[in-house]
Amino acid sequence: MRSIIPLIAVFLLVGSALQMIVAAPNLSDEIDETGMNRHTFSLLPKAFQKNPELEMTGFTVMTDYGKTQPVASLKNPVYYQIHNGGEQLRGEITTYSEVPAAAVLADMLERSLAVAGYQPAKGPQKPALLLNYFWGAHDRMDSDTAEKFPELARNYVIERALLIGGKDYARRLSEELDRPSLVIDHTLKADFLRDQAMDDLYYVVVSAYKFDDVAHHKPQLLWRTTMTVNSHGINMVQGMPALIVMAKDFYGRQSTQPMALRRDVRTGTVKLGPLEILESGPSVSAPSPSK
């Protein structure tokens, strides 16, 4: 097993300089629209579709330490302060002209966390958690560059796999790249995840630490939620808010495996269309996640 995966995981850790930010909500309360599941096929490229379909993944890793902490709920909220790590471009770095406003993302993040039972600490309320979040793009190499630098191109794939499904999925995909004969799982979900790791994507990462541990310079990860979306045919202004909205069902909830999701985005809004969850077989209908 290559040693690259633990090294790659370092980029997900919180920085030493922590700036506490509490955003004041200023958008409509309705940030998510759910409905019955369906999948629509279009011959038009995403860039020309009125409501382009988003191909997303969601995953949360929970540490043993995190399992000892209180579970957040609407009745028993967990309070936090937040550090905005900002935009981070990775892989074959590309310049993006359409980037969402930091204040808009902070607002949406606060409200999606609230749906999951996490509230910002205000006034005398002491925070239990320090949340660190950052977002950006992770792009693959073009074929010519990948031929010249195959090892670096491979490392980029593993980095994207880490964002998609954590160390276990990154390790499994690494083994498949080393031995293509191991690729025996060609279910809809398995192919979806593999394609996601091979292609350009946008991502959002939210990591949770116990606030007192950070204050004493002994941060230990509690949980980390990572969301990705294939970036072809959509810009960051469309992709990032959608990821943050969908993350509400993943914060602080351990994932046994990465979730593969398809959903359309309503152009010009932050509302999402019906959700389709891809299972390890033919796609099936499933209730939309709770608001």
Go through each PLM region and give its residues:
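A structural "domain/chain start" motif
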Residues: V22-V104, Q125-L129, Y133-A146, L272-K291
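Short secondary-structure boundary motifs at beta->alpha junctions and helix caps
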Residues: A24-P25, H186-F192, Q196, V205-M259
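Bacterial N-terminal signal peptides
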Residues: I8-Q19
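Compositionally biased, intrinsically disordered linkers/stalks adjacent to structured regions
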Residues: L243-K291
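Surface-exposed patches in mature extracellular/periplasmic domains of secreted proteins
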Residues: V115-A128, S255-R263
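Envelope-exposed proteins and targeting segments
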Residues: N76-V78, A116, P127-L129, D200-V205, ...
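Second-shell loop/turn segments in exported
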Residues: L89-A101, G117-Q119, F192-D195, M227-I234
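Surface-exposed short loop/turn segments
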Residues: F134-V214
